[in-house]
Structures are given as structure tokens and as C-alpha cells.
Amino acid sequence: MALTKEQKQEIIKQNSRFAKDTGSSEVQIAILSAEIKQLSEHLKQHPHDFHSKRGLFMKNSKRRDLVKYLANQN
């Protein structure tokens, strides 16, 4: 259910500012978005998986905070 190493590397490659940039807000938001998409698909098939639903809410909250931070910085 989690992103594979190759998927994460591809996301980092597409959204990084420079080589090996894993900590920038853009990269973190992109990774969270991919994880949220996977969790949403999982929850469509398993609607009573409350542990995953909580994880989805936490990831959404973290992404929202990062987007707000990025908007304030730029």
C-alpha cells in the first residue's frame, strides 16, 4: 500500500529543485499527494478500514499545512 522506492524516486526527480532534494516543500507535498491518492483508492475498496482512514486524515492535514507554509513563503 505504501509507495515503492522507485515511485518515490520518480516523484522526487520530477519535483526537486536540485539533485537529491528530498526536503523541499514541493517534494514533500508531491509525495503526500501520491500517498493520499493510494489511500483513497484503498478506502474505496475497504470502507471500514478506520486505521487507514485516520492515516488519510493525518496526511491531508500535513499536506494542507505544507501548502499553507509554501503560500506564505512565496
UniProtKB/Swiss-Prot annotation:
Pfam family name, one: Ribosomal_S15
Protein's GO biological process: translation
InterPro entries registered for this protein in UniProt: Ribosomal_uS15, Ribosomal_uS15_bac-type, uS15_NS1_RNA-bd_sf
Keywords: Ribonucleoprotein, Ribosomal protein, RNA-binding, rRNA-binding
Record's GO cellular component terms: cytosolic small ribosomal subunit
SMART domains, sorted: Ribosomal_S15
Signal sequence annotation: none
Residue runs in coiled coils: none
GO molecular function: rRNA binding; structural constituent of ribosome
Complex formation: Part of the 30S ribosomal subunit. Forms a bridge to the 50S subunit in the 70S ribosome, contacting the 23S rRNA.
General function of this protein: One of the primary rRNA binding proteins, it binds directly to 16S rRNA where it helps nucleate assembly of the platform of the 30S subunit by binding and bridging several RNA helices of the 16S rRNA.
Family as reported in the entry's similarity comment: Belongs to the universal ribosomal protein uS15 family.
Protein name (database record): Small ribosomal subunit protein uS15
The organism of origin for this protein: Onion yellows phytoplasma (strain OY-M)
